[in-house]
Amino acid sequence: MAKIVKFGDEARQKMLAGVNVLADAVKTTLGPKGRNVVLDKSFGAPTVTKDGVSVAKEIELEDKFENMGAQMVKEVASKASDDAGDGTTTATVLAQAIVNEGLKSVAAGMNPMDLKRGIDKAVNAAVAHIKSIAQPCEDGKSIAQVGTISANSDSHVGDIIAEAMAKVGKEGVITVEEGSGLENELDVVEGMQFDRGYLSPYFINNQESMSVEIEQPYILLVDKKISNIRELLPVLEAVAKSGKPLVIVAEDVEGEALATLVVNNMRGIVKVTACKAPGFGDRRKAMLQDIAILTGGTVISEEVGLDLESATLEHLGSAKRVTMTKENSTIVDGAGVAADIESRVAQIRAQIEETSSDYDREKLQERVAKLAGGVAVIKVGAMTEVEMKEKKARVEDALHATRAAVEEGVVPGGGTALIRAAAAIADLKGDNEDQNAGIGIAIRALEAPLRQIVSNAGGEASVVADKVKNGEGNFGFNAASGEYGDMLEFGILDPAKVSRTAIQAAGSIAGLMITTEAMIADKPSEGGAAAPDMGGMGGMGGMGGMM
């Protein structure tokens, strides 16, 4: 396949054109008065969004060189989204500002490598300043404010996320699903829930909800299949004497053993129910151990020299309540020792740090949540499917932002923190004039998000930027109301992690673009789609639309 190669200024101008097309589309969504972007979908209604990364993902340009520029900026948005969950539009605006100024300086004859070194110095100094001014975000009010700002000033979203975090703790799992109503709903599962239900409908004792509800049970955990009732008899007799109910969690309970348990339960000899252990293979062993630690029991496993016949009441865990439906089982208020649970959580966290697989990380985080907190589900409600998708994306963004805020703290929002970072590094010096120019480019670029927020709100960007620059600390501009004042008092907060990631991602990609000297792309085929028909096979022309 023949290639086209472009060099120097010609290559950079093409790349810049692509950067500007993508960034101009994305930056219209920035701020409380950001505009909507409508995305065409090949099936169904178009999607309306104010989410920067959704807009960026849609853009593919026809010119291959321009498209390379656009894709590199798209990478900035994706990086910000992956690392912090938000700040995609801010990162794109910063990258565009640095690239535009940087390429002008390269065209004026400055050394691209020194410009990049200067930009990197300024980025590192700005990130250090952001970290230094971050304030912890721990109370429900500030969590709600961060969620509200990230969900495009929708206070209902901020409040529901704060409520979810209050109920399941900072470590709890919060998931977002499409609801069936018109309003957002919060559904909280206390305790440990796993996706295995009762093994026989004959265990059901609540006919209304078709579930098994057992109070203050003993819990027997077995890492094997139970098919012979003789193995179970010693434990069953001991439990029957104690007068408490029994919950069995095993790899499986089948045949004679299951039939005997059902008969005992129905006759009221011993109140018992059984379910399969969650997970498979090594993950099942680990999750059984989690349940053991949560309930203060021991897993009966031949690997550790314990068999079912020698099990006693000391080996059994207990809990305040166990509920089982056809699909799920929930253990509430296990009797485990708090210190043991904490050390187990710390152990799983260490595994999260080490794993390179996203799937494993997600499963490990779920285990932490089940041990440490609980699980909350936010069900997003809307009138139409288009609105539902847009709203769900906003709630997910807001959730990521609040997690980032809890992790690294918050800074004044609305572009104010970046203006303060620019002022803090104004005296930074490089090793030569070209590096100083690079530092200057990055400092000026830090004003771009505030200017864009103001112009999206219909204000005069230069006037507002000067006024905010002349202020101190948290003094900034509230674009939603058009007022100046303390951003923290207005409740306009950005997670420090989001601001930091946006600066780093933008600086990194912009540095690469400024130092680009050649671009290579496939040569387009002659005539493209309008090639002459293939003799007698002219009828195949219509197949183009089928691809």
From Swiss-Prot:
<dbReference type="GO" id="GO:0042026">
    <property type="term" value="P:protein refolding"/>
</dbReference>
<dbReference type="GO" id="GO:0140662">
    <property type="term" value="F:ATP-dependent protein folding chaperone"/>
</dbReference>
<keyword id="KW-0547">Nucleotide-binding</keyword>
<keyword id="KW-0963">Cytoplasm</keyword>
<dbReference type="InterPro" id="IPR001844">
    <property type="entry name" value="Cpn60/GroEL"/>
</dbReference>
<protein>
    <recommendedName>
        <fullName>Chaperonin GroEL</fullName>
        <ecNumber>5.6.1.7</ecNumber>
    </recommendedName>
</protein>
<dbReference type="GO" id="GO:0016853">
    <property type="term" value="F:isomerase activity"/>
</dbReference>
<comment type="function">
    <text>Together with its co-chaperonin GroES, plays an essential role in assisting protein folding. The GroEL-GroES system forms a nano-cage that allows encapsulation of the non-native substrate proteins and provides a physical environment optimized to promote and accelerate protein folding.</text>
</comment>
<feature type="binding site">
    <location>
        <position position="414"/>
    </location>
    <ligand>
        <name>ATP</name>
    </ligand>
</feature>
<comment type="similarity">
    <text>Belongs to the chaperonin (HSP60) family.</text>
</comment>
<feature type="binding site">
    <location>
        <position position="50"/>
    </location>
    <ligand>
        <name>ATP</name>
    </ligand>
</feature>
<dbReference type="GO" id="GO:0005524">
    <property type="term" value="F:ATP binding"/>
</dbReference>
<feature type="binding site">
    <location>
        <begin position="86"/>
        <end position="90"/>
    </location>
    <ligand>
        <name>ATP</name>
    </ligand>
</feature>
<feature type="binding site">
    <location>
        <position position="494"/>
    </location>
    <ligand>
        <name>ATP</name>
    </ligand>
</feature>
<dbReference type="Pfam" id="PF00118">
    <property type="entry name" value="Cpn60_TCP1"/>
</dbReference>
<dbReference type="InterPro" id="IPR018370">
    <property type="entry name" value="Chaperonin_Cpn60_CS"/>
</dbReference>
<dbReference type="InterPro" id="IPR002423">
    <property type="entry name" value="Cpn60/GroEL/TCP-1"/>
</dbReference>
<dbReference type="GO" id="GO:0005737">
    <property type="term" value="C:cytoplasm"/>
</dbReference>
<comment type="subunit">
    <text>Forms a cylinder of 14 subunits composed of two heptameric rings stacked back-to-back. Interacts with the co-chaperonin GroES.</text>
</comment>
<feature type="binding site">
    <location>
        <begin position="478"/>
        <end position="480"/>
    </location>
    <ligand>
        <name>ATP</name>
    </ligand>
</feature>
<keyword id="KW-0143">Chaperone</keyword>
<keyword id="KW-0413">Isomerase</keyword>
<dbReference type="InterPro" id="IPR027409">
    <property type="entry name" value="GroEL-like_apical_dom_sf"/>
</dbReference>
<dbReference type="InterPro" id="IPR027413">
    <property type="entry name" value="GROEL-like_equatorial_sf"/>
</dbReference>
<feature type="binding site">
    <location>
        <begin position="29"/>
        <end position="32"/>
    </location>
    <ligand>
        <name>ATP</name>
    </ligand>
</feature>
<keyword id="KW-0067">ATP-binding</keyword>
<dbReference type="InterPro" id="IPR027410">
    <property type="entry name" value="TCP-1-like_intermed_sf"/>
</dbReference>
<dbReference type="GO" id="GO:0051082">
    <property type="term" value="F:unfolded protein binding"/>
</dbReference>
